[in-house]
């Protein structure tokens, strides 16, 4: 696997592959990789001839008082895991390479509506940062297909909307969430949790499962949400939001909607965890 910070080197290699009629898949990450990321690479290998991965802790998507400086940087371990998984090209730019004029003078991409609620309401500017860096990386790598985890469901929807709105010739693939044996969704931020907190945090997925079952049986969504919030409080969480949405467009769920998704964000101690569950209502 070849690792570079150089935009020109990435473009040269991708151009060579495409001239040979070969396809390119892309997996953007912030590093500190876990099995969920490796699964994205494995899936990417099924969909293209070559896999490019990026590692960039994007300062534009972190708000004030968030964990930018504390976010783990584990490049050597990440490189070893990616090489073992079959990635061929790793792009590891610095903020100065990505934002040479500084973030305040950087052209940005913003997806209206989707970016402003749920995680967007709790983290203003977050999805502007996500959309901007993903669009920029797409322009650098020029992939045929890009893969993202469904754990970040709202992010996946924002990226799909951006690609559609800007007519980018890239297929966006969502990959199912990879979980610990307890049910806790794998996340780089799980490393902030103590072992006891990890066991407590598994209640988040159990709560989502119980909500989906109750809604599928016809219970009123507001009542289900209220009960679930009480459950999370009792389990030691401080809920940020808990919302049932149409899975296709993230509108508030209507009685006629069949394909639904429950989205949740909650703090366990000082660590903010997110999860979601898609299900069908009869």
Swiss-Prot record:
ATP binds at residues 30-37, 149-152, 178, 186-189. Beta-alanine binds at residue 61. It comes from the Bacteria. Its EC number is 6.3.2.1. The keyword Cytoplasm applies. It is found in: Cytoplasm. Pathway: Cofactor biosynthesis; (R)-pantothenate biosynthesis; (R)-pantothenate from (R)-pantoate and beta-alanine: step 1/1. (R)-pantoate binds at residues 61, 155. One of its GO terms (molecular function) is ATP binding. The active site is at residue 37. One of its GO terms (cellular component) is cytosol. It catalyses: (R)-pantoate + beta-alanine + ATP = (R)-pantothenate + AMP + diphosphate + H(+). Keywords: ATP-binding, Cytoplasm, Ligase, Nucleotide-binding, Pantothenate biosynthesis. SUPFAM superfamilies: Nucleotidylyl transferase. Catalyzes the condensation of pantoate with beta-alanine in an ATP-dependent reaction via a pantoyl-adenylate intermediate. Homodimer. Belongs to the pantothenate synthetase family. This is Pantothenate synthetase. It comes from Shewanella loihica (strain ATCC BAA-1088 / PV-4).
């Amino acid at each position: 696997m070849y690792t570079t910070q150089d935009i020109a080197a990435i473009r040269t290699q991708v151009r060579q592959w495409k001239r040979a009629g070969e396809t390119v898949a892309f997996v953007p990450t912030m590093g500190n990789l876990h099995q969920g990321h490796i699964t994205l690479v494995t899936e990417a290998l099924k969909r293209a001839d070559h896999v490019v991965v990026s590692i960039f802790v994007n300062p534009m998507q972190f708000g004030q008082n968030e964990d930018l400086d504390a976010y783990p940087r584990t490049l050597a371990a990440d490189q070893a895991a990616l090489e073992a998984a079959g990635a061929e090209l790793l792009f590891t730019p610095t903020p100065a390479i990505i934002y040479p004029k500084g973030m305040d003078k950087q052209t940005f991409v913003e997806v209206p509506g989707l970016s402003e609620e749920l995680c967007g309401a709790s983290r203003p500017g977050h999805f502007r940062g996500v959309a901007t860096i993903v669009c920029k990386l797409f322009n650098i790598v020029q992939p045929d297909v890009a893969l993202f985890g469904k754990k970040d469901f709202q992010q996946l929807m924002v990226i799909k909307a951006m690609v559609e709105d800007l007519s980018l010739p890239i297929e966006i693939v969502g990959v199912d969430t990879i979980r610990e044996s307890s049910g806790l969704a794998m996340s780089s931020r799980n490393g902030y949790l103590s072992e006891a907190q990890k066991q407590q945090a598994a209640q988040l997925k159990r709560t989502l499962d119980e909500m989906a079952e109750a809604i599928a049986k016809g219970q009123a969504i507001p009542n289900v949400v209220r009960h679930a919030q009480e459950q999370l409080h009792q389990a030691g969480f401080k809920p940020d939001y808990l919302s049932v949405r149409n899975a296709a467009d993230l509108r508030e769920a209507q009685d006629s909607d069949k394909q639904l998704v429950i989205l949740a964000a909650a703090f366990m101690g000082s660590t903010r965890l997110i999860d979601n569950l898609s299900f069908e209502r009869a």
